[in-house]
Curated annotation (Swiss-Prot):
Additional record remark: Heme 1 (or BL or b562) is low-potential and absorbs at about 562 nm, and heme 2 (or BH or b566) is high-potential and absorbs at about 566 nm.
Role: Component of the ubiquinol-cytochrome c reductase complex (complex III or cytochrome b-c1 complex) that is part of the mitochondrial respiratory chain. The b-c1 complex mediates electron transfer from ubiquinol to cytochrome c. Contributes to the generation of a proton gradient across the mitochondrial membrane that is then used for ATP synthesis.
Name the record gives this protein: Cytochrome b
Originating organism: Marmota baibacina
Membrane topology annotation: Multi-pass membrane protein
Amino acid sequence: MTNIRKTHPLIKIINHSFIDLPAPSNISTWWNFGSLLGFCLVTQILTGLFLAMHYTSDTMTAFSSVTHICRDVNYGWLIRYMHANGASMFFICLFLHVGRGMYYGSYIYFETWNIGVILLFVVMATAFMGYVLPWGQMSFWGATVITNLLSAIPYIGTTLVEWIWGGFSVDKATLTRFFAFHFILPFIIAALAMIHLLFLHETGSNNPSGLISDSDKIPFHPYYTIKDILGVLLLILILMILVLFSPDFLGDPDNYTPANPLSTPPHIKPEWYFLFAYAILRSIPNKLGGVLALIFSILILMLFPLLHLSKQRSMMFRPLSQCMFWILVADLITLTWIGGQPVEYPYVIIGQFASILYFTIILLILPIISLIENKLLKW
């Protein structure tokens, strides 16, 4: 009798995706982040579901409902902080996952890569709307500032913003619709993640060398299932240290003040994972220019397959490109720091320089270095 794992229509799909999947024998820990992102998504959906059972999306009661969750609901504080810090872990894994793809040339599988970039956009939108829900000062003003950016769109901008707001300012209608979208989007993310995997399994995984690994494949289970479980345990450890010892470490103290449309916080800034994009937005004095730079700072990832001019796929054997890649990482860390600083000298100048460097490295320097490396190897 044939194993049910290989014959049952549904179990067969799971088998081909997670058990009998041929995987390269040399993929490193950098390949763990896909499974970690899956784990983060499941955790966020579950904690979010339990939070939604007690949350009310009304401007009068939203803030107090979050307080009620933390004070009166059994382990409500744990669920709330796991959800808030889980988002940070999600973005850490996302950035490392994208960075891995850039370093090892995974973007050559352009269908998988482009779905991944769309996923990044949707996750960022979801996180932004989630940040608005507690209805603290930073929630309200963050929503006001970011939605207001759409007014930079010529001709239809103002109408579009008022349509999104559901009125003439961020108010009850805005909060209610943001809650509705924040609830539905994670399920859309899950569907997109399945498409992401579908495209990946069409080609098979890349590996650190960037070479074709068809001649040396091993089954995903038990080798990489064990490896992924180790990664998940480490993620849980870091998340729980954060949640249990310093749950507000990555948050903003302003969000413990209920939203007040009459009082603007001294420094309006988003969560840490948006600061790099926020710094790019602020570094351009023109509103429309800033918005375009903000969108393009993420959309530029879609150009990576077109900008790949090297004869080698991975950066593993390309020291010049490696050096430039790490300068890009340092530049992004600088942008993240600048995004959290007030708009004054010298931060403005540093932000503008770092923003120019970000686009220059990706669009100009990396492709040129690739050509130089080809020349050095007489290719």
